Amino acid sequence: MASQARVRGAVAIAAAVWACAACGSATPVAAQGAVTVHELASGLGHGARVLMIGAHPDDEDTSLLTWLARGRHADAAYLSLTRGDGGQNAIGNELGEALGAIRTEELLAARRVDGARQYFTRAYDFGFSKSVEETLRHWPRDSVMGDVVRVVRAMRPHVIVAVFSGTPRDGHGHHQLSGQLAREVFDAAADTVRWTVRGFGAAWTPQKFYRAARFNAAAATLGFDVGGYDPVRGRGLGELAAESRSQHRSQGFGSAPRRGSVMDYVRLEAVRAGDPSAKESDLFDGVRLPFAAGDAAARRLGDRITALRLALDLRAPWRALPLVDSARVAAEAWCAFGRPASALGDVCRGTVPVPATMRADSADVVLVGVRLLEQLRQLAAAASGLVLEATVDREFVAQGDSATLTLRITNRGPRTARAAIFTPSAQPMPADTIAPGGELRATLPLPRYARTEPWWLVGGRAGDLFAAPAATVDDEVRSDRPVASVPALVDGITVQLRAPITFNRVDETRGEVTTPLAVVPRVSVTLDGGATALARAGAPLVRDVTVRVTGFAQRAESATVALRLPAGLAADRATAPVVLVPGVAQAVTFRVRGTLAAGRHELQATVTAGGRTWSEGFQ
């Protein structure tokens, strides 16, 4: 977004910048240790998928999501219609799109705790809405519904859970609409006449539809204890759910941990699985799951997973690597229907999407297989005793600049390992051995990465819908953060190590501080004064306008700062010279005088350096 000033009402001056959502955010790290190994092994072979649908970040039932993902090991996800752009901010001054970027990161942080995935539609949160009718004046129903259909057809949930009732008692038009669309998509996902395969993906038929009833147990058809205790982790699911909830810091949603029994409730409203008249005892009663098919390949895979679990020693997990690899081979064969070397094998390995022409039951198997193979990859990495760290020499790298990437692989296990590091030209460096207790360090040029920015803000908005198409993959994946990947061998078994690329520094009071690599514009230019400033139309205006300029090139360079003013205003000087020192923010102040007519006007700050002009900034 351009660093511009906008005028509303009489006269309003606002600076708009793109928010660097990943800058300074929590970095997803490669999980290690007994808890991770135990959880990954326990989660193998569970094929149920559940999608919860609400309106905003923090609407989700984190207790239910945590129980589903961490307790039942289901593939659980939350679809939020919005990113919470129109909410309040308890931790800063950011509002609008910038707040939406913050709340997106908070939601992704919550999902890392509770284990679920995260989706969004294109809807921009325009603020409180008194009714669904008012909401639909901002969001065309078919546009938002189309996004919900796309997500459901991509994820293919067996069960859908609506957070809200879809009635006026929800109290917020956004809440009410989310409850309505959740019920509608239960049927619409299979309707290829209105929602074509070409435009919205292959048809899918969810098997059960519930509404959350955690605050109305009397209306529930099913209740369950979501507060179970995990002795390996040493924490209960209720404690994890509270930690997930507490990630919504901008909304002041810090939660106390809940220990012991925690009951949650849902109400069954539609069902296509099992006997609809039978009394339920479980959320998945009657649901047809791929592993339940009982064919020879599924039994073979199930036997290998069982053998792996029984043999796994959390104090020496590397001993189970041959069984992990054996399960991987069986999983590839099961997922690819006996043809792991075929194009379908590439689908199972997650390198290409599931074809829209594939039968629904076959696609169900493949989706479970894709998840299982990724779980086995993570399990092999976590059990190998190898740790990959990928660091850069500075936190901000300007687009087009070079930087140094350092890869360090530490061998904490008792077996000698080998690792092959590929250069940006895809040529491998000579493979090196890593003795127990030793490490391999390699330095190479940082590959070129796209600019670090909230992907949904690219293209701006059309009214209250973002222009960028809604993602049909987990938003963590869609964010496409820079990641290093290195193949290694332990006892002849391939282990794929992955780690986020970070900048690490030591703070005297906090110890090591890790921040994700941010690829930024060569120059960042923003305007002081917040989102909006007002002035009286037709009256003399005298105002200081301060421009904040930061250079991120590797070396200092000379630049000029200028203002592009609306008719009726003039600055005390045409340009101001400045020397851009890498990473140092500087303030340049112009005195603006004149008068403006009533209406909306724009003021833009620009910086010219090295023959190029920039008018964007980030925060």
Question: What are the functions of these language-model segments?
Answer:
Residues P355-G400, N504-G538:
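Low-complexity, acidic Ser/Thr/Pro/Gly-rich terminal tails and inter-domain linkers that flank the onset
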Residues T443-E476, V579-V581, R593-G599:
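Short, surface-exposed loop/turn segments at beta-strand-coil junctions that are enriched for proline
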Residues T27-A154, Q176, R183-D187, D191:
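Active-site rim/loop-helix segments in enzyme catalytic domains that contact anionic ligands
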Residues S479, S485-F552, Q619:
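Acidic, serine/threonine- and proline-rich intrinsically disordered appendage/tail regions
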Residues R412-A450, A559-V581, R593-T595:
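Proline-anchored loop/turn motifs at beta-strand termini and strand-loop-strand connectors
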